[in-house]
């Protein structure tokens, strides 16, 4: 399990031979209380810390993109606060790994991510990440995929893209005119902003950035997406899908993410 696991009903089991992760979802594993001393993260590699940050963004971003009317306001606050904390403090921590305040900020941000997925839920990027366990850490895999899935979700997430675009612009990762855009142009501008942040912390931003990625992973991803045990991720997408939609729609996302080409992604109206 990755960031926020100490707060949530989610865990997982990974088959290292098949290279596939599967979910455990049960309210019984939600703790009555949790204690996280963020200072213990000082001893872990910087890559692990930043992977947690990427996972925190993924949790709040995916939950916010899938928000219903009754949860929209709360998930917006969680997404904006999480992004603010991470975009401001990740660069500080890279410059000074002993910066206690920056480390605590990232810890709080990822805790908000855990809260977000208890209110909403994750979707496409998390689903794909489960098939990349032999190549990438969880947060990095989600961080690669969310910009590309956002384009797929374009018709359903325009208000969310305006909000996320504002935060990215605040930290110099999105163009000044992002909020004036609409439709696919807006979503692609936000996607490019998320990719720019990933590059700024030296994270992979394309599937081909992962050493060893190949066609077998594409087929593994598509096969897993059709697995009934993971159907909740398809159904939880802002543009809900079934196994029959995996090809061509989800496949177009994977092909686009392979070489960083947003134009390859098909949109399901």
What are these regions (language model features)?
Residues 172-269:
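C-terminal charged capping/lid subdomain of soluble metabolic enzymes
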């Amino acid at each position: 399990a990755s960031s926020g696991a100490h707060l949530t009903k989610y865990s997982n089991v990974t088959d290292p031979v098949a290279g596939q992760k599967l979910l455990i979802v049960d309210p019984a594993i939600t703790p009555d209380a949790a204690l996280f001393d963020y200072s213990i993260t000082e001893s872990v590699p910087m890559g692990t810390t930043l992977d947690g940050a990427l996972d925190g963004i993924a949790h709040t971003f995916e939950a916010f993109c899938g928000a219903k009317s009754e949860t929209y306001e709360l998930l917006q606050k969680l997404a904006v606060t999480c992004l603010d904390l991470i975009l401001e403090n990740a660069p500080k921590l890279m410059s000074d790994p002993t910066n206690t305040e920056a480390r605590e900020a990232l810890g709080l941000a990822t805790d908000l991510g855990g809260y977000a997925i208890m209110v909403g839920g994750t979707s496409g990027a998390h689903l794909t990440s489960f098939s990349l366990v032999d190549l990438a850490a969880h947060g990095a895999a989600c961080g690669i995929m969310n910009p590309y899935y956002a384009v797929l979700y374009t018709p359903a997430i325009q208000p969310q893209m305006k909000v996320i675009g504002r935060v990215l612009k605040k930290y110099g990762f999105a163009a000044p005119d992002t909020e004036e855009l609409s439709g696919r142009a807006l979503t692609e501008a936000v996607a490019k902003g998320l990719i720019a942040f990933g590059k700024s912390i030296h994270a992979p931003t394309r599937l081909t950035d992962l050493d060893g990625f190949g066609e077998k992973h594409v087929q593994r991803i598509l096969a897993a997406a059709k697995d009934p045990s993971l159907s909740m991720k398809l159904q939880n997408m802002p543009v809900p899908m079934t196994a029959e939609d995996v090809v061509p729609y989800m496949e177009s996302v994977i092909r686009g993410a392979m070489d960083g080409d947003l134009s390859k992604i098909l949109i399901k109206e």
